[in-house]
Amino acid sequence: MKCPYCSYNESKVVDSRSTEDSISIRRRRECLECGKRYTTYEKIESVPILVIKKNLNREYFDRDKIVNGMIKACQKRPVSRQQIEEIVDEIEKKINNSMITEVKSEYIGELIMEKLKDIDEVSYVRFASVYRQFKDINTFMEEIKKLKDREL
């Protein structure tokens, strides 16, 4: 591991422990040249997941795309970046645990909407309007009615 301070290639591990989510290992290292300490993280490389788009094209799962879409839907709403990251973590974990290598974009969209519905209904409707391509105000009203009926 290359030292970030002096670029020397050898170091020793001073401390090693699992992270809270148990999907990576945090290591404290000490450079054998300059003696400075730094932290590294090791993560198991997962099998790449392909997303099948509506037009049947395939592309690699892109976590940032999901995060950015959710940020837009949650803009000026009481939803923190941390909440968004946690939702995406849960979705990514669910897909990885299913042991499938291809997943439809519709499935991912439904998972996102399911999570948003529970934390902020306005963000949910915003996301759904883009994802489901609402054509007019009536489509919005139908979705809002479903939310209201759910509360009763």
From Swiss-Prot:
InterPro entries: ATP-cone_dom, NrdR-like_N, RNR_NrdR-like. A zinc finger (unnamed) spans 3-34. Keywords: ATP-binding, DNA-binding, Metal-binding, Nucleotide-binding, Repressor, Transcription, Transcription regulation, Zinc, Zinc-finger. The keyword Metal-binding applies. It holds the Pfam family Zn_ribbon_NrdR. Its cofactor is Zn(2+). One of its GO terms (molecular function) is ATP binding. Residues 49-139 form the ATP-cone domain. One of its GO terms (biological process) is negative regulation of DNA-templated transcription. Binds 1 zinc ion. Belongs to the NrdR family. Negatively regulates transcription of bacterial ribonucleotide reductase nrd genes and operons by binding to NrdR-boxes. This is Transcriptional repressor NrdR.
